[in-house]
């Protein structure tokens, strides 16, 4: 008879523990119920990206010395650098530079290790196309700067909740929103 009593006690303890776990999970669910929704109406509302966001790469053709450091540090050997050695000035001359963003993992190693800072990350993340071959950007397409989201009057920008409060008397421009 003694084992039967301990079995009922274990069953009772397990039932109380299960009820406590169910109650805790229900309280977590209720605490999330009164929060504002995170979703936004994307084409018309865009959230402002953080300062260290890794978007499309911007390339400045005039600064590049064709050293190919970006190719060596890239984990997938992605940037294609075509150059020719000019014997009269004894320097490399850059002919073509391209990056395929369909393959790029946006790690930022090329930007970090570039000795002349000719590569930089932009805040552009809208790279979707119907043809994957359109994601292969040459030096001309990489040299174009994206339109900033903050300055666009047709799009309502949604600020993240963890951003600092911006003074109401300051106009919204790209210099105002820097601390994320």
Curated annotation (Swiss-Prot):
Transmembrane segments: none annotated. It holds the Pfam family Fer4_7. [4Fe-4S] cluster 1 binds at residues 64, 67, 70, 114. Its cofactor is [4Fe-4S] cluster. It is an enzyme of class 7 (translocase). Keywords: 4Fe-4S, Chloroplast, Iron, Iron-sulfur, Membrane, Metal-binding, NAD, NADP, Plastid, Plastoquinone, Quinone, Repeat, Thylakoid, Translocase. It is a peripheral membrane protein. GO terms for biological process: photosynthesis, light reaction. InterPro entries: 4Fe4S_Fe-S-bd, 4Fe4S_Fe_S_CS, NADH_quinone_OxRdtase_chainI, NDHI. Its EC number is 7.1.1.-. Residues 55-84, 95-124 form the 4Fe-4S ferredoxin-type domain. Binds 2 [4Fe-4S] clusters per subunit. [4Fe-4S] cluster 2 binds at residues 74, 104, 107, 110. Belongs to the complex I 23 kDa subunit family. NDH shuttles electrons from NAD(P)H:plastoquinone, via FMN and iron-sulfur (Fe-S) centers, to quinones in the photosynthetic chain and possibly in a chloroplast respiratory chain. The immediate electron acceptor for the enzyme in this species is believed to be plastoquinone. Couples the redox reaction to proton translocation, and thus conserves the redox energy in a proton gradient. NDH is composed of at least 16 different subunits, 5 of which are encoded in the nucleus. This is NAD(P)H-quinone oxidoreductase subunit I, chloroplastic. It comes from Amborella trichopoda.
